[in-house]
From Swiss-Prot:
Binding-site residues, [2Fe-2S] cluster: 3, 6, 18, 25
Swiss-Prot/TrEMBL keywords: 2Fe-2S, Cytoplasm, Iron, Iron-sulfur, Metal-binding, Oxidoreductase
Enzyme class: oxidoreductase
GO MF annotation list: 2 iron, 2 sulfur cluster binding; hydroxylamine reductase activity; metal ion binding; peroxidase activity
Sites bearing Cysteine persulfide, chain numbering: 405
Protein name stated in the entry: Hydroxylamine reductase
Catalytic activity: A + NH4(+) + H2O = hydroxylamine + AH2 + H(+)
Family the entry assigns: Belongs to the HCP family.
InterPro entries to which the protein is assigned, alphabetical: HCP/CODH (IPR004137), Hydroxylam_reduct (IPR010048), Prismane-like_a/b-sand (IPR016099), Prismane-like_sf (IPR011254), Prismane_a-bundle (IPR016100)
Gene name for this UniProt entry: hcp
Protein source organism: Actinobacillus succinogenes (strain ATCC 55618 / DSM 22257 / CCUG 43843 / 130Z)
Amino acid sequence: MYCVQCEQTMITPKGNGCSFSQGMCGKTAETSDLQDLLIACLHSLSAWAVKAREYGIINHEADNFAPRAFFATLTNVNFDSARIAGYAQQALIYRNQLIKAVSAFESNPTLDHPLANIELNGVSVDKLARQAKQFALDTDRAKIGEEAHGVRLLCLYGLKGAAAYMEHAYVLDKFDNDIYAQYHGFMSWLGTHPSDLNELLEKALAIGSMNFNVMAMLDAGETEHFGNPVPAMVNVRPVKGKCILISGHDLKDLKELLEQTEGKGINVYTHGEMLPAHGYPELKKYKHLVGNFGSGWQNQQKEFARFPGAIVMTSNCLIDPNVGDYADRIFTRNIVGWPGVTHLEEHDFSPVIEKALECDGFPYTELEHLITVGFGRKTLIDASDAVIDLVKAGKLSHVFVIGGCDGDKEERHYYTDLAYALPKDTAVLTLGCGKYRFNKLDFGTIDGGLPRLLDAGQCNDTYSAIMLAVTLSQKLGIGLNELPLSIVLSWFEQKAIIVLLTLLALGVKNVYSGPSKPAFLNDNVMALLHEKFGLSGLTTPEQDFGHIIGKNA
């Protein structure tokens, strides 16, 4: 086992990365190795998808499957070895379909790619796990050096984050053949084990550039299905009655669940990255969508254990449900999986509803605590003139974008301290589950109107923040980096990595990121990123605030 993709990975004097019987996330060595094998098979699939496109051959099923299966290897998504092995087998089935299609144009087609002809040594999990060891992601690290290896992983993990957003868009009927072509190009290239540092950095930015279009596509899918988010108050305290908790990112699953539970006397609560759902008109109209429960994903074992109903995980982040003894009432959907947990293949939530009715539910209604969400792209852009007026009047000095992933490191209290210590003439635009560090605090308003805390949505709604910045830049006639706007990113896994690469690809400078640097990037690479893009790690809220204001003075 070698896995170094998330913030919680092992860091020791002997080296970084989880490399024993189990990762810090709870993933077994077997599952981790099988994920490496799956990635190798996906490299092969993409290599042939690139070749097939030379003849105008597009296999839509393969195009959809590839990023979806890659998503399964994201942190805290799928811990089920059998399903990972199944994805590897399916990847080669699609690969072989592409080879057959190319054979209509070439007799005995070949491909100059190290993984073009990879085959699996059987079908059993045990056999595949043994084979998988040769595809560990650190096999050539000593040969190519820490810097090149780290930036290659930056590309791989960034592309993994983009693949997740591609899958989120696809379930909302949004896809683009040009984006699929770019994805396959990057995935095929990564399978050749590239080691030129300059090329790797260029590709990292190109992956970020592609992801901007993916996020735009996802934004279109969400707004076309559910309407443009509008500011809305959300109760974060329990309401008496039977209940279901839904977590993850898949708003379509939530819509289906709301339809199927309507009139059944069951209250539905959002959790984690589902919180922004309360701002979408086509979701908030359901009266039994009563509120949000819990906090960041890392607290789920305690919070899910005391939630008296059924739970649905639609995407990341899932951790071991056996710890809190709720494995019998949690259900996985889509690409998510945990051994022994009931997986729902389709949108039939009958088992979830039955379980919710069996459970006790909340015995009484607690006193309301309301927070505000719903500051999506359209709302933010519509407010751009008001923001400019406040800036010109000297009432709004700076906007801080504080968002990204949450996690359980003590150092993450930095984000709470920073947000709460900011001057009253500043605003905080937040997105992703990092918001749970401060979104229940009262930040008040600026000049009695603009809320100082603006929740723009899920991590992929970085697109909304970017479009606000672009709009302000155009209206003020200044560059993006001249705006009184700064980004303090909270990273944990691969979605945050691709968000960072997207920002860098757009030319955004001086991003602050933490609470610690990725374990796969050494100090030399971090120094290079600081030199090229102004990327900085975190120190203290006071010191970083001083640097930010000093640069924008």
